[in-house]
Amino acid sequence: ANKLNRKPALDTKIYTHPVGNSKAAGQIDAKSLELKADSSIFLDPAWQDGSTIADASFLSAAAVSGDLAGQIAVGQNSVVALNSTQANAISAFNQLKNASDLTWGTSGVTAALYVASPVNVASTGSINVNGILTSASYANAGAVTVAAKGLLLVDQANVGSETVLNGASLTMDNSSYVGIINATDGTIKLADSITGTPLVVTDNQFVTGDVTDGVVTTTVDNQKLAGAVASMGVQQMARRADTVFANTIADRTAQSLAGEGVALWVDVGGERYEADDLDNGAQYKANMFYGAFGADVGVTPEARIGAAIQYGSGDSKSDNYGIKNDIDAVTFGLYGSYNVTGAAKIVGEFGWTHTTNDVTASERLLTNDFDADVLSLGVRGQHEFQVGAVKIVPSVGVRVSRISTDSFNVGGVKVDVDDQTIVQVPLSVAFAANSIDANGWKLNPYAKVSFTPTFGDDEINVRGYDQSALDTLPVQGNFGLSATNGNVTFGAALSAGFGQDCAKNFGGKVGVTYVF
């Protein structure tokens, strides 16, 4: 129907429009509803086995024209949706049902009034929501009543500072429900006055609500939400991509000779990373694979510069909310080294990492797509000592990283994660045996132990709540072997590490370098 206009006939006092009966549901989906004084609408179908809200009698109006001056009775298995289509009303209830224990039926919600945006109730108008009604019974003029097992459903995004049922007095049974969709922090004034203390249910498990003096107050549980955000692993896995790139550059510059010609190199590897004991039960496990390609050249007998690109792909999974995050990470970087003496070297590197995160979860509101970026600048110094047949190379450096995470929405809640600035102090000692000749190949076994204390914004700030997210005390061990024949060098290495909050990782890589 385009417009449902209910007004009294000339020879009668009241015009009644029934919707549904004891045998079947009736459904009216109008573009506009104009309900005049002394007119009434009654909805009442019988219950059927397996009934859902889609089987209920429905009166929906995409727009309410003027004040509601007539009477509406919402009986058993019935729904009235004001300023909403029927499809949107069904979707709104299902949002609520999916986030709570509410069901539609004789043991759950038996009748509902959905107010998608505020309406005006005239002094002659009334609405009675009562799921036991099988014959018309109307509330007093100017009143809205919701009986036990009845539901008043409101879209918080459309209410703002207005009154949901303006001009009405609202009476709600203590066993009735106020349902809030698109729930977020805020207050909702339901009516000019309210009697009763209904149960408040939201479509967002991170938002709770209660009713006091006719006002619903909704509050976001930022602590719980922060734990869910940390379980996505977004910030730490962006940092891991940045760290893997930095380690690759460190290995390359440690091996290269300043005066060599153009060198091309490729590294391919993967790792398993786990964080099991973050704040608020946050945890995840990730599998990532990386491939890096770079080129460098000697520009003076003491200096060498290069550039590289790294691509990473994988996923992290958490038992919390069934979270899975499909991650792609691209890193671009520049690096250079300068030989201060034959044994001492200074290395600098710059990297930009961009990650995309495709998050899915059993809690549907956590499903999101958003990006994170890391900008890093680092410098380190190393010195080589020959002790018998072993070269020992200690190094110390400093790296500053800026981690930025895009905002995203969890239902009606906007999540802003503050940018993080961290300062890392990589300390390492590498051990390399003198070359072993084998049929024209020079074999070089090596090992490296590193410790990187981290300072700064190691926690993410989610809506004002600080949540642990980054490992600030990572320890890493590597063992590898390189084999050189002429201009080509092959390498392979295994790695393992541990850190704060039960963080641990293990992985491996292979690589090849060709010097022209």
Which role does the model predict for each range below?
Residues K224, M232, G259-F516:
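Membrane translocator/pore-forming domains, dominated by Gram-negative outer-membrane beta-barrels
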Residues H17-V19, L133, A493-G497:
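Short strand-loop junctions, especially beta-strand C-caps/beta-turns
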Residues P8-L10, Y15-A24, S40-G50, A54-S117, ...:
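Outer-membrane translocation/initiation segment of Type V secreted surface proteins
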Residues V144-V146:
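Fold-core signature of tandem repeat domains
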